[in-house]
Amino acid sequence: MALTCTDMSDAVAGSDAEGLTADAIVVGAGLAGLVAACELADRGLRVLILDQENRANVGGQAFWSFGGLFLVNSPEQRRLGIRDSHELALQDWLGTAAFDRPEDYWPEQWAHAYVDFAAGEKRSWLRARGLKIFPLVGWAERGGYDAQGHGNSVPRFHITWGTGPALVDIFVRQLRDRPTVRFAHRHQVDKLIVEGNAVTGVRGTVLEPSDEPRGAPSSRKSVGKFEFRASAVIVASGGIGGNHELVRKNWPRRMGRIPKQLLSGVPAHVDGRMIGIAQKAGAAVINPDRMWHYTEGITNYDPIWPRHGIRIIPGPSSLWLDAAGKRLPVPLFPGFDTLGTLEYITKSGHDYTWFVLNAKIIEKEFALSGQEQNPDLTGRRLGQLLRSRAHAGPPGPVQAFIDRGVDCVHANSLRELVAAMNELPDVVPLDYETVAAAVTARDREVVNKYSKDGQITAIRAARRYRGDRFGRVVAPHRLTDPKAGPLIAVKLHILTRKTLGGIETDLDARVLKADGTPLAGLYAAGEVAGFGGGGVHGYRALEGTFLGGCIFSGRAAGRGAAEDIR
């Protein structure tokens, strides 16, 4: 599905757009900005949406996404025998977030409000606008600690039928043909205009036209300047994941050394510029050291943006080894604790790890994040989806990474596999005996129906959930079983993705100053605001919460701005 929004009217580029009036300006045409614009337009207000990229990039990172949504006690869960509740979800959220700072007051208020939304009207509100949900519910971030610690106690990851593009299209369709909504692409905001202690507009640079495809780097050559005025400005410009300089600048000391090698899970235009611009205008920025970067990144053999990486969404069965060939500690199993794994890796002195698995595991347990890596789900082709899951071998996109990727090796014996791993570039040579000891010890634990090995126990527990048993988790077996071969190893990189801190706001998305009072006329939503309040997730996330955070905070910003304008 191509979402180019070619039928949506643009503000006239360059000096002809000078002085265009609007009730509200939205900076950023990603999901949060689109939702905010819909709320404003529904209330009869004139909206101008500015974005530094071309119209091909409408929808921002949501377009590239898997379309996962965090829902609580949904019909999809109940059909699968999952007993969820608001109370359990809030327990999981707060245990995961671990709020512990004075500046976490508003983020925690947002957390309570968001769980209310996810357990309440979120599903019905989205379905009324056209959302369709895939019937199997995924179980992300399983935790592995105690009941009050990190992780989802039950599966809550609901996949949009049509993935990210279908979710974006819900709001694009609402804005299409609305005469009160205008887009100004290739308009890069450089400054928020502050007059009389209030934000009254924006100034910036008109960039030269670009016909680059979605996600590809575009020119920053200036062809003019602009200034627009409005009663409200909503910043919905995204995070810092494409700006490795900012990622490194804000890297938390508690996470160990700053990685030297990073892949990018987002395009270069996810640059975090507006965070600093808002701060210069008086906005409080909190929790800049909280980030969400994935540890299962692989190099894209067909990159769209610089250092383009793809995340593996793994099932729980792969053996996870560090760069020295030692098994990661409990409970750092695939899909259990992203941040805990990241901290272990950075403190290990290396920037990569290994999955060791076999053909049987990769066939069922490897999914690649992103709509372009899931053409059956994205294209809403049920027949193709069923065929791809029923036939022997991994899904086509996974097989393509095995065949063409630079991070995968396979062999018929473990000794041959370790030799192949050692041939990959930029690796510390692995000792065969160290790897063999980890594999052999793990394989001994699957002989019985019970085990002291925490990962094997977790795999068996996961298979008691119908969704995992049917489509996600293989039965425990020896990695070295010839019938399950060949053996496979995947070199995993750290992949930048989400900004968890950001511009501080109240529950109406009003931007706050350092003294805690609102900066009149300014609102923030989406990743630039830490998905709500300056960090609704705290230190960690439960997954399916980023798109939902953009929707919830974008809705709050649109409604809050409309109320104040009226």
From Swiss-Prot:
Binding site for FAD: 23-54
GO MF assignments: steroid dehydrogenase activity, acting on the CH-CH group of donors
Cofactor: FAD
Pfam families with a match to the protein in the record: FAD_binding_2
GO biological process: one example: lipid catabolic process
GO CC, one annotated term: plasma membrane
First-tier enzyme category under EC: oxidoreductase
EC numbers on record: 1.3.99.-
Keyword entries, A-Z: FAD, Flavoprotein, Lipid degradation, Lipid metabolism, Oxidoreductase, Steroid metabolism
Pathway noted in the entry: Lipid metabolism; steroid biosynthesis
Record bears the keyword Oxidoreductase: yes
UniProt-listed InterPro entries: FAD-dep_OxRdtase_2_FAD-bd, FAD/NAD-bd_sf, KsdD_DH, Succ_DH/fumarate_Rdtase_cat_sf
Family recorded in the similarity comment: Belongs to the FAD-dependent oxidoreductase 2 family.
Protein name, as recorded: KsdD-like steroid dehydrogenase Rv0785
Protein's organism: Mycobacterium tuberculosis (strain ATCC 25618 / H37Rv)
